[in-house]
Amino acid sequence: MDCFHGSLVSARKNCPSASAQSQVIDEYLKEEILHHSIAGPFRCPPIMNLHINRFGVIPKSTPGKWRLITDLSFPLDGSVNSLIPDSAAQVKYIGIQEAIDKLIFLGAGALMAKFDIRRAYRLLPIRTADRVFLGMRWRGNYYVDLALPFGLRSAPKIFTKFADVLEFLLSRVGSITHIQHYLDDFFLVGKPNSNECQSALSTCFHLCRE
């Protein structure tokens, strides 16, 4: 996670949205524990000097769905994110022009497909030594995040490294010729009047499930 010890200040309370959507928080923690992405609940901190972060939820684009965000930037001068260097957070994303170039190369009628990775960040485990930075407190109990959290300054770069490797591996398999990604969104292109795009999409689904 490339975070260095310093004068961290633990949060005393969570974001207002956590209290406003307490049932959402309860369900989220229950689900993440089932996925082994969060450890808890613990009556006492399970790790010595566990740093406690505040958290809240924001609505997703799908009605009724929520995303938990760990506020790793609070307080400004005593947060986890304040200790992460710029070099660990800088990431270069693909531009729309690269996707356009693929379409132009294949010509009019080119077929396109898009898929994303379910749970994305939450698939990537946090190394044991960094878990001390990712404590949470809810209803008097302590929890420890075991997976890459939304709100971590270096999370996009960390996930992009994973997605870059996945794109490379998929591009070397069978019919997957034209593929690129932006974070967890993958874009496929196939020749006009062919099953190239559909075949590539099916292959991606099969390999990712494995």
Where are these regions (language model features)?
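Short hydrophobic/aromatic-rich motifs at helix boundaries and adjacent loops
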Residues: M1-D2, G135-R139, S175-H178
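Non-catalytic, polymerase-adjacent accessory regions of viral genome-replication enzymes
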Residues: M1-S17
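Hydrophobic transmembrane signal anchors and adjacent membrane-proximal interface regions, especially
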Residues: G6, N14, E31, Q180-H181
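A short small-residue
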Residues: L8-V9, Y143-A147, L183
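Low-complexity, intrinsically disordered/propeptide-like segments
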Residues: A11, K114, R172-V173, E210
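Catalytic-core region of right-hand nucleic acid polymerases
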Residues: P16, A20, V24-T160, L207-E210
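Active-site palm subdomain of RNA-directed nucleic acid polymerases
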Residues: P156-R209
